[in-house]
Amino acid sequence: IDTGDEEQLLSRLYSVLEDDIDIIIGPVFSDKVNQVREVTKNKDIPIVAFSNNSKIQDNRLYVFGLKLEDEIKELLTYSIKRNLKKYAVLVPRNEFGSRVEKEIKQFQSKNNLSTFIFTFYNPNSPDFYDVSKNVSNFEERKANLEKKIKQLEKENSEKAKEELKKLKKLDTYGELNFEALIIFAQNFQEVSNFSSILPYYDVDPKKIQYIGSSLWAKNLSLKEPGLDNGYYASLDINNRRKFEDMYLE
């Protein structure tokens, strides 16, 4: 079971419940899963959901997706091995974003990691340009450039003149305060939008390590130039193929 809105979901659910069904597979998102559970609470029908929210599972509801806490643990463990220490995190300002923040901070505390800078965006109408500027602290670094140019203009040395020539070709002054950017968005279209815009505000994927959730584990991600050097959580491809072969048999 999975549909685009609550009304269609409930309509289809009541329809299938009239049949003699043994199991319900779906939906994907935890809010819809909770609706299905509520409607079927008086029926002994197991539910297998594709959500990654382990908080909703119980003795009748099985969660089949990758657990968020496992994704974050694996991604950060791998990142530590690559000697990445300073991270920016981009998440929606909602329950999902709060879960990501909580899991990252718990991992941070247990592993003595120093820097995680969180940027939250409005999940209902994200301003991708404004959020991308906030991630890179663009306005402050732009002001730093203007300040540095004024400072050099007061000097009369050849060295200052040479530096001025270089600075006037730039948009900002100063390095980013993170080495890696973790993007846990609600859907892949948001990931695509951010990856297209972030480089314009100095978050260059050739210099900054992009890190993502299992949401990125789609063929579409391979077509996004901004994500070419990124890595993301995913099921083991060999085990997945074994499962698919068994399922087809």
Residue ranges and their predicted role:
Residues 3-7, 29-33, 52-56, 70, ...:
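Solvent-exposed loop/turn segments at secondary-structure junctions
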Residues 22-120:
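Extracytoplasmic ligand/sensor domains, especially the bilobed periplasmic-binding protein
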Residues 7-15, 34, 38, 73-77, ...:
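Solvent-exposed, polar/charged alpha-helical surfaces in well-ordered, non-transmembrane soluble domains
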Residues 16-23, 176-179:
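Short acidic/histidine-rich motifs immediately flanking catalytic phosphotransfer sites
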Residues 1-15, 71-74, 124-136, 159-167:
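Structural motif
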